[in-house]
UniProtKB/Swiss-Prot annotation:
Domain of life of the organism encoding this protein: Eukaryota
Main location: nucleus
Modification N-acetylalanine, positions: 2
GO CC, one annotated term: nucleoplasm
Gene Ontology biological process terms, A to Z: DNA damage response; DNA repair; double-strand break repair via homologous recombination; mitotic G2/M transition checkpoint; response to ionizing radiation
Name this protein carries in UniProt: SOSS complex subunit C
Organism: Homo sapiens (Human)
Function recorded in the entry: Component of the SOSS complex, a multiprotein complex that functions downstream of the MRN complex to promote DNA repair and G2/M checkpoint. The SOSS complex associates with single-stranded DNA at DNA lesions and influences diverse endpoints in the cellular DNA damage response including cell-cycle checkpoint activation, recombinational repair and maintenance of genomic stability. Required for efficient homologous recombination-dependent repair of double-strand breaks (DSBs) and ATM-dependent signaling pathways.
Keywords of the record: Acetylation, DNA damage, DNA repair, Nucleus, Phosphoprotein
Amino acid sequence: MAANSSGQGFQNKNRVAILAELDKEKRKLLMQNQSSTNHPGASIALSRPSLNKDFRDHAEQQHIAAQQKAALQHAHAHSSGYFITQDSAFGNLILPVLPRLDPE
């Protein structure tokens, strides 16, 4: 138990050190950005939040795609119907495909 808690303490210290280093580097970049407002590199720092948002959106889409795949596999395994993955206004991950029958 003591070895486990000391390992967690080391991990926490390591995380704190990494976060402190990132914060320090962020401040340094912000200071450089403020001092050189006419520099073309300044636009790179301003576009960075959109990159983070794009990365987050991509990760979300991958997660949804994995959920859709799992739902599709489950539906195919437990049903004789046919299903497709499609975005739904109601939040459904998969939709059943219903054939149109000619009225008799």
